[in-house]
């Protein structure tokens, strides 16, 4: 017995709907890859889930400088005559292409600066790279000297602050020791003044031998 025909309608159960979506999406993307490889066809598939999650596939073309999806959409627009984006989007696309090309050129220059891919360059281009490297080395040396001078200046400032703090601590120690001596001298001086001001009878002990003889 053959399988019964499945009615195509929205699946109400969210879990079953998600499972079916995952299976069908995987099948579509697999078929897109297969037809691209087997038939050397350009295929572009864009799928959005009900939650807005994107799944896409485009047959890669290593000879093209444009992103695969942009290339396919541009080709579709040219062949179908349908306008997929307005002048604003065209301008944005052109800006993206310009930035991408500029980035590619910078990557090439960076490889040249690192000594890579130099075989295809002319002597004039090699001289320009050498001058750029020399200028970069000079700028780097100047920057390092600036950092060294700043480090020495900060080191001198810290040394001066340390000397100032040491001087203040020493000054406080001197003032503190001088104050202690003044207190000690004042204490002895007060003792002498107190003894001198006492009456004679209080300053002589009654048990003194001379006093006993006088009695």
From Swiss-Prot:
Q: Would the keyword Nucleus be found if you checked this record's keyword annotation?
A: yes
What's the domain of life for this entry? Eukaryota
Q: Which Gene3D superfamilies match?
A: Transcription factor, MADS-box
A Gene Ontology molecular-function term? RNA polymerase II cis-regulatory region sequence-specific DNA binding
Q: In which tissues is it expressed?
A: Highly expressed in lodicules, at intermediate levels in stamens, and weakly in carpels. Expressed in pollen.
Domain MADS-box stretches: 1-61
Xref: InterPro entries? MADS-box/MEF2_TF, MEF2-like_N, TF_Kbox, TF_MADSbox, TF_MADSbox_sf
Kindly provide the name given to this protein in its UniProt entry.
MADS-box transcription factor 4
Q: Identify the species of origin.
A: Oryza sativa subsp. japonica (Rice)
């Amino acid at each position: 017995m053959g399988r019964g025909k499945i009615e195509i309608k929205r699946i109400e159960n969210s879990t079953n709907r998600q499972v079916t979506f995952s299976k069908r999406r995987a099948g579509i993307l697999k078929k897109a890859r297969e037809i691209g490889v087997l038939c050397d066809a350009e295929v572009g598939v864009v799928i959005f889930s009900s939650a807005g999650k994107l799944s896409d596939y485009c047959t890669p073309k290593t000879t093209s400088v444009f992103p695969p999806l942009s290339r396919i959409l541009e080709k579709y627009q040219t062949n179908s005559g349908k306008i997929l984006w307005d002048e604003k989007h065209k301008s944005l696309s052109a800006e993206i292409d310009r930035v991408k090309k500029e980035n590619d050129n910078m990557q090439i220059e960076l490889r040249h600066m690192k000594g890579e891919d130099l075989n295809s360059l002319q002597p004039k281009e090699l001289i320009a790279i050498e001058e750029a490297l020399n200028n970069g080395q000079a700028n780097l040396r100047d920057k390092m000297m600036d950092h060294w001078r700043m480090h020495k200046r900060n080191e001198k400032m810290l040394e001066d602050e340390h000397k100032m703090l040491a001087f203040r601590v020493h000054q406080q120690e001197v003032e503190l020791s001088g104050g202690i001596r003044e207190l000690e001298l004042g204490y002895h001086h007060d003792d002498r003044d107190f003894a001198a001001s006492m009456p004679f009878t209080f300053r002589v002990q009654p048990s003194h031998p001379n006093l006993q003889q006088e009695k």
